[in-house]
Amino acid sequence: SPLSSEEITENYVKSFNPSISLRQYQIDALNEVARQFDNDSKRQFLLEMATGTGKTLLCAALILRFLKSNNAQRVLFIVDRIELAKQTMEEFGVILRDYGPVIYKNARKHPAELLGSSVVVATIQSLMVDKRFRKEFTPFHFDLVINDEAHRSIYGDSREAVQFFQGTKIGLTATPKAYLKNIDTGKLVKENPKALEARQLRDTYNFFGCEPGEPTSRYDIIDAVKDPDGPYLC
């Protein structure tokens, strides 16, 4: 089914937690991903969101929409610290409870539980130990891979793990790195191809298939402060 067949309103997750409503900017981000997924067959997305604007809730709603519309059966959510994995599980454990979310570091001791879960939360470090991601999963095990703090997880060894998985990729970050904006790539590739390659490897927008400086959806700190219905109460 189209991703947009699963309609999104502010009440989308209320049945799991009556005190939680989606804000309009979260609904807009969810719908822009669905529009590009359905209409443009896009499979890479970058969501720029200021700190404190509800990234985890947005991710839970994203995952729920992919699972309920049958556009994903298994989802990997990558964070860069175990504390974040635990915090994420607190929210996922409520909204995604029907899908048996697990923390990879704990669940890998029980392979059946790990392989049977629809939602796996993992630190990039735990996936990288002894290249576990290659030994325990196939490239197509996860239909959806979401990267929290995406500007960090595309560097060095971490990049290998993220690129290994072939599912739809969504990156979230408050601080995307733009190394290709206002760069004449045609000129640079002739003058210094290695410099261009270095910029491409470090550019968050490029990694997630977006034009330089243009994420799939943006709700930065300026938007948050100006928004009368936003998360910041001044």
Spans of features found by a protein language model:
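ATP-dependent helicase/translocase motor core
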Residues: 1-74, 83, 87-98, 116-119, ...
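Conserved SAM-binding loop
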Residues: 22, 77, 147
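An acidic- and aromatic-residue-enriched active-site/binding cleft used to recognize and process polar
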Residues: 50-52, 80-82, 150, 174-175
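A generic local structural motif
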Residues: 63-64, 71, 105-109, 130-135, ...
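Anion-binding and metal-coordination hotspots
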Residues: 78, 92, 214-217
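Conserved helicase motor
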Residues: 79-82, 103-112, 124-129
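Signature of the SF2 helicase/ATPase Hel1-core->accessory helical subdomain module
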Residues: 128-134, 138-234
